[in-house]
């Protein structure tokens, strides 16, 4: 199931760098991670849903690109973000 508005607001509030920050790489990666984790549960039940799997792969690739960007811009922020989200890289 998709993220609710309350879930999105909580993630944005936790990872925002400023008050109305919704576009920083940290926020975008955190939102993508929540959606990816949600879809992983969906695929445990619906193994043959290849259409949604394509969307999942697209999200994973987008998250990887954002993490690569953040790593190049500010390695300290990158390390703290992957530590907070529990990502292995």
From Swiss-Prot:
Concerning Gene3D superfamilies, the annotation shows: 6.10.250.3130, S15/NS1, RNA-binding
Q: Name one GO biological process term.
A: translation
Answer yes or no on keyword Cell membrane. Answer: no
* Keyword Membrane annotated: no
Recorded hits in SMART domains, A to Z, give:
Ribosomal_S15
Question: By its UniProt entry, which InterPro entries does this protein fall under?
Answer: Ribosomal_uS15, Ribosomal_uS15_bac-type, uS15_NS1_RNA-bd_sf
Superkingdom as given in the UniProt entry: Bacteria
Q: What are the GO MF terms of this UniProt record?
A: rRNA binding; structural constituent of ribosome
Q: What SUPFAM superfamilies does the record tag this protein with?
A: S15/NS1 RNA-binding domain
Classification via Pfam families: Ribosomal_S15 (PF00312)
The UniProt keywords, alphabetically, are:
Ribonucleoprotein, Ribosomal protein, RNA-binding, rRNA-binding
Tell me the PROSITE patterns matching this sequence: RIBOSOMAL_S15
Question: What are its GO cellular component terms?
Answer: cytosolic small ribosomal subunit
* Role noted for this protein: One of the primary rRNA binding proteins, it binds directly to 16S rRNA where it helps nucleate assembly of the platform of the 30S subunit by binding and bridging several RNA helices of the 16S rRNA.
Assembly notes: Part of the 30S ribosomal subunit. Forms a bridge to the 50S subunit in the 70S ribosome, contacting the 23S rRNA.
Describe the family membership recorded for this protein in Swiss-Prot or TrEMBL: Belongs to the universal ribosomal protein uS15 family.
What is this protein identified as? Answer: Small ribosomal subunit protein uS15
The source organism is Acinetobacter baylyi (strain ATCC 33305 / BD413 / ADP1)
């Amino acid at each position: 199931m998709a993220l609710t508005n309350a879930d999105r607001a909580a993630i944005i509030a936790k990872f925002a760098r400023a008050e109305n920050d919704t576009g920083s790489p940290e926020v975008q990666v955190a939102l993508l991670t929540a959606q990816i984790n949600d879809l992983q549960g969906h695929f445990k039940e619906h193994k043959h849903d290849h259409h949604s799997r394509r969307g999942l792969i697209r999200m994973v690739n987008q998250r990887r690109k954002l993490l690569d960007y953040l790593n190049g811009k500010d390695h300290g922020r990158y390390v703290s973000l992957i530590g907070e989200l529990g990502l292995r890289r």
